[in-house]
Swiss-Prot record:
Family: Belongs to the VOPP1/ECOP family.
Protein name per Swiss-Prot or TrEMBL: WW domain binding protein VOPP1
Membrane topology, record value: Single-pass type I membrane protein; Single-pass membrane protein
Signal peptide limits: 1-22
Transmembrane segments: 61-81
Subunit record text: Interacts with WWOX (via WW domain).
Keyword Membrane: yes
Highest taxon, organism lineage: Eukaryota
Compartments it resides in: Cytoplasmic vesicle membrane; Late endosome membrane; Lysosome membrane
Stretches the record annotates as Disordered: 142-172
Ranges of the Extracellular topological domain: 23-60
Transmembrane as UniProt keyword: yes
Organism: Bos taurus (Bovine)
Length: 172
């Protein structure tokens, strides 16, 4: 009898589930009177007593939400990685160009001392190139053989190896 009780309980439970299951109640007009029919929960009513299996993906709002969040995350991560791997070039200020006036080919005698023009310290005493070795190193050579006079040649000490440590310490 115990097994009979379990069978009856299972049957009643099955009927309860069948009755409470979410079903779609559909209807359509056949002439002047509506005709009612029932579709399963995963089906949609199609009009004339037929049920069509519904695409449930349109009802899954969380699927679309997660999909859009995934797309936004991938775009953001790609943008971040691209900016880190290929940073934009630094915007540099325009180069500070020092303009100077060239001396005429035939200068008036006594107007300026003979020699090539040179740069000195702006706050300096304006010494002669012979007295200022740094000014000698940065002399401008307007008639250079390179064809471009945009920059002065490198200082002469750039082409020689540095002095030994002992020599530098002894001179101080």
């Amino acid at each position: 009898m115990d097994s009979l009780a379990w069978r009856v309980a299972a049957l009643l439970l099955g009927l309860l589930v069948e009755c409470t299951e979410a079903k779609k109640h559909c209807w359509y007009f056949e002439g002047l009177y509506p005709t009612y029919y029932i579709c399963r929960p995963y089906e949609d009513c199609c009009g004339s007593r037929c049920c069509v299996r519904a695409l449930s993906i349109q009802r899954l709002w969380y699927f679309w939400f997660l999909l859009m969040m995934g797309v936004l995350f991938c775009c953001g991560a790609g943008f971040f990685i691209r900016r880190r791997m290929y940073p934009p070039p630094l915007i540099e200020e325009p180069a500070f160009n020092v303009s100077y006036t060239r001396q005429p080919q035939n200068p008036t005698p006594g107007a300026q001392p003979l020699g090539l023009p040179y740069y000195t310290d702006p706050g300096g005493s304006g010494m002669n190139p012979a007295g200022n070795p740094v000014a000698m190193a940065f002399q401008v050579q307007p008639n250079s053989s390179q064809g471009s006079t945009a920059y002065p040649p490198p200082p002469s000490y750039c082409n020689t190896p540095p002095p030994p440590y002992e020599q530098v310490v002894k001179t101080k």
